[in-house]
Amino acid sequence: MKVLQEINLTYSILVIADFSSIFGCLLVLIAFKKLKLLRNHITRVIACFCVSSLLKDIISTGLTLSLGPQNEAGSTSFQCYLYAITITYGSLACWLWTLCLAFSIYNLIVKREPEPEKYEKFYHGVCWTIPLICVIVMLAKKTIEPVGNWCWISEKYVGYRFGLFYGPFFAIWIISAVLVGLTSRYTYSVIRNSVSDNKDKHMTYQFKLINYIIVFLLCWVFAIVNRILNGLGYYPTLPNILHTYFSVSHGFFASVTFIYNNPLMWRYWGSKIFLIFAKFGYFVELQRRLDRNKNNNNPSPILNSYAATVYHSSTIESLSLQHNNDISNDNQQQQQQQQTPQQPQQQFQQQQSPTVIEMQNLKQDQNIENNEQNENCYNTIDTNIEINTNKLNDNSFEITQPSNDLNTIENNNNYNNNNNNNNNNSLVIEKEKDEREKKDNKF
């Protein structure tokens, strides 16, 4: 009787997890379809994950309902083979798309890849081919049998379970964790050295970088623990229930994470949900505000974009520091000039020839003009950053190319240095001429 109750409980949890995963993936895919602002490289990777999870969950749900709690499928039936193929192929594909997501984010932020779309064909080749190889090996070795509420690799083939399924899981998760760790380390270094005061929001952004990989681990860690216990001959109830629910509902929790990371998406669905209450007079203002801002590219200190955030944070930081250093240097020069006695300067200017004085005045005019050009470049950079910020989507994950104004400032500085060197050489030549003329006059 206790075993029958456990089977029925596990079956109910399995059905709930299947439907919740289907629901979550549909929410993400519908939002991507409706919101054109979300269509970019990263969202295409997420969409492929959701498609893989959705197809897996639809097929497995149909098989679960048709076989019933007792799993009446025979070990050689078509339904049993289809169930095992669906679980193995669909789960591996979802894991690999998660790895591709981690690599894409790392590639955009740390490596600043200008054309991440060129990797999409490689992603498709890996994510659809590797699961197929594992399925072919599983079928060739005839390892499939009814296992609890579904069909999968028999308990007699523990080596195949870990070699074809949980072994790739460990490899995929470790590589994804390393990529996310490198990305988080890079962004943290930018945030720590940033001049921005919104560090709390920056830490929220930092959490958004790693939450999907945490969900990935939590959803499958119970499955690994349960299978290790099964391999040792133990079949506890609680690990089996946790394994059933979290592994099957991975698509749901991943979809919730994607929606949480993207304000455009939760505004869109929030406006749809509160529209029902607004018809009865509840949450009217909230629904209007969400509907009004669902397509709004709200600029924020973190820009709500993985790649654009890091680029603009580092750019603003470097420009601010450079600009502050220039201002401090100018202030120091002005203070030194004010502290210097004026009478010796006037006497020195009277002793100098008119040509030398004109050259000094020309040098000062050129320095003023060059400073104005640099100031205009800084203003242009600030304007371009503001324009690019307004064009970004919330969590659109698009990267913006660096502005050419940085090169302009560098060229202006090089030009200033060359002019200063030429002016100094001219002053030395003029001084030598004056000294020679004075010596000639003495003789």
UniProtKB/Swiss-Prot annotation:
Residues 325-354, 396-443 are annotated as: Disordered. It comes from Dictyostelium discoideum (Social amoeba). It comes from the Eukaryota. Residues 332-352, 411-425 have a biased composition (Low complexity). C-terminal Ser or Thr residues may be phosphorylated. Belongs to the G-protein coupled receptor 5 family. Glycans are attached at N8. InterPro entries: GCR1-cAMP_receptor, GPCR_2-like_7TM, GPCR_cAMP. Receptor for cAMP. Regulates axial patterning and cellular differentiation during late development. The activity of this receptor is mediated by G proteins. It holds the Pfam family Dicty_CAR. This is Cyclic AMP receptor 4. GO terms for biological process: adenylate cyclase-activating G protein-coupled receptor signaling pathway; cell differentiation; culmination involved in sorocarp development; negative regulation of gene expression; positive regulation of gene expression; signal transduction. Residues 396-410 have a biased composition (Polar residues). The keyword Transmembrane helix applies. It is found in: Membrane. One of its GO terms (molecular function) is G protein-coupled receptor activity. Residues 1-11, 66-89, 141-161, 230-263 are extracellular. Residues 33-44, 111-119, 183-208, 285-443 are cytoplasmic. Residues 429-443 have a biased composition (Basic and acidic residues). Its main location: membrane. The lineage of its organism: Eukaryota, Amoebozoa, Evosea, Eumycetozoa, Dictyostelia.
